[in-house]
Amino acid sequence: MAHTLAQKILQAHTDEAITAAGQIVRCRVSLALANDITAPLAIKSFRAMGAKKVFDRDKVALVMDHFTPQKDIASAQQVKLTREFAREMGVTHYYEGGDCGVEHALLPELGLVGPGDVVVGADSHTCTYGGLGAFATGFGSTDVAGAMALGETWFKVPPTIRATFTGTLPKWVGAKDLILRLIGEIGVDGALYRALEFDGAAIEALSVEGRMTIANMAIEAGGKAGLFAADAKTLAYTAARGRKDAPLSADPGATYERELTFDVSGMEPLVACPHLPENVKPVGEVRGVTLDQVVIGSCTNGRISDMREAAEVLKGRKVAKGVRCIVLPATPGVWKEALKEGLIETFMESGCIVGPATCGPCLGGHMGILADGERAIATTNRNFRGRMGSLESEVYLASPAVAAASAVAGIIAHPGSL
């Protein structure tokens, strides 16, 4: 049988023959992941199961990223519980404090995920690693606890939707715009329990970091996973992080449930309007919407390429009076590289608030909460009502370039208009 990428990866991790979508299979996992919000629940379930040790201390990752630095007593208690569990179990990949970053930016940077892996995480944006050619998906904490104990889990083999992006990307149009275009087309449930497989000339032209941006938001269309073939760019990325991976692609003749094609030629940057990621419009149609806050960072767009994109727009310009522009490089590695390249100086001179590697305001956690009636544009992945604070606030989603341009203009703006 010719396999899609999802089927091909799952097949390599099970002893059962995968012959059709919808089949239930037991698969070995390459990595089980949880964070400071979800790990305590997973630990509770782990102990309730009677488990005494994790299946492999090198294949469990616990990343304290959502409320870091701990914002209150409750979050400090969550981290303390997880820290003690990690010590008890001898977990190799426990990250907190100065070596911690936003999990879905940190783990690829450390070489802990790569092509052909099966990764389960107690976080919905675990699908990010599909940008590297891994079958990665978000689980509930209880299922992750089972994977931590057993080293395996079950899957229903998902059907696959193939999304092909053709043409050449115009200036200021990038990965964030491509995934917003797809979500705008099929809706937030358009890929419900489907794997999304991305290809085409525009996809091949993207950096690995750009591909991870797209994979990150597969879940915003309901996707079980968002997958990219592992090509020369992928292998160069993982090799630089100490891995030895092989090329990986779908089999010729694989069966897809649906095939979509998008021509990116002449595209304008896109913005997702409140209160769903599917409410997508060209930036020109929302130009002029006033803003109180801009957030540049997150597991979607907090990598070094995103910092460079934002700095290109902000250099020599000032953030508009009355606008808070918060920049959160996603990992210590990104922070150090941004400092080395002078990007941090650019942000500071522009009047930005530059903070630590944290999820922070993305989930309405801290470091940038919106009040009643306030409006933000962010490079994050969700804009549900109340996502960044008050139920009476609004969040628009966009690329780092559009977010930076909007910070300067004080209104939603095209970076080419400055």
Swiss-Prot record:
Q: Which GO terms describe its biological process?
A: L-leucine biosynthetic process
The alphabetized UniProt keywords are: 4Fe-4S, Amino-acid biosynthesis, Branched-chain amino acid biosynthesis, Iron, Iron-sulfur, Leucine biosynthesis, Lyase, Metal-binding
Please give the SUPFAM superfamilies that the UniProt record associates with this protein. Aconitase iron-sulfur domain
Top-level EC class = lyase
Q: Which reaction does it catalyse?
A: (2R,3S)-3-isopropylmalate = (2S)-2-isopropylmalate
Which Gene3D superfamilies does the entry mention?
Aconitase, domain 3 (3.30.499.10)
Q: What is its EC number?
A: 4.2.1.33
Q: Name one Pfam family in it.
A: Aconitase
Q: Keyword Iron, does the record have it?
A: yes
Cofactor(s) recorded for this entry are: [4Fe-4S] cluster
Key word RNA-binding present in the record? no
Quote the InterPro entries the UniProt record gives.
Answer: Acnase/IPM_dHydase_lsu_aba_1/3, Acoase/IPM_deHydtase_lsu_aba, Aconitase_4Fe-4S_BS, Aconitase_4Fe-4S_dom, HAcnase/IPMdehydase_lsu_prok, Homoacnase/IPMdehydase_lsu, IPM_dehydratase_rel_enz, IPMI_cat
- Pathway membership, UniProt: Amino-acid biosynthesis; L-leucine biosynthesis; L-leucine from 3-methyl-2-oxobutanoate: step 2/4
GO MF annotations for this entry?
Answer: 3-isopropylmalate dehydratase activity; 4 iron, 4 sulfur cluster binding; metal ion binding
Q: Which PANTHER family does the record match to this protein?
A: 3-ISOPROPYLMALATE DEHYDRATASE LARGE SUBUNIT 2, HOMOACONITASE, MITOCHONDRIAL-RELATED
- What does the subunit section of this Swiss-Prot or TrEMBL entry state? Heterodimer of LeuC and LeuD.
| Biological role stated in the UniProt entry | Catalyzes the isomerization between 2-isopropylmalate and 3-isopropylmalate, via the formation of 2-isopropylmaleate.
Q: What family, per the record?
A: Belongs to the aconitase/IPM isomerase family. LeuC type 2 subfamily.
> What is the protein name stated in its UniProt record?
3-isopropylmalate dehydratase large subunit
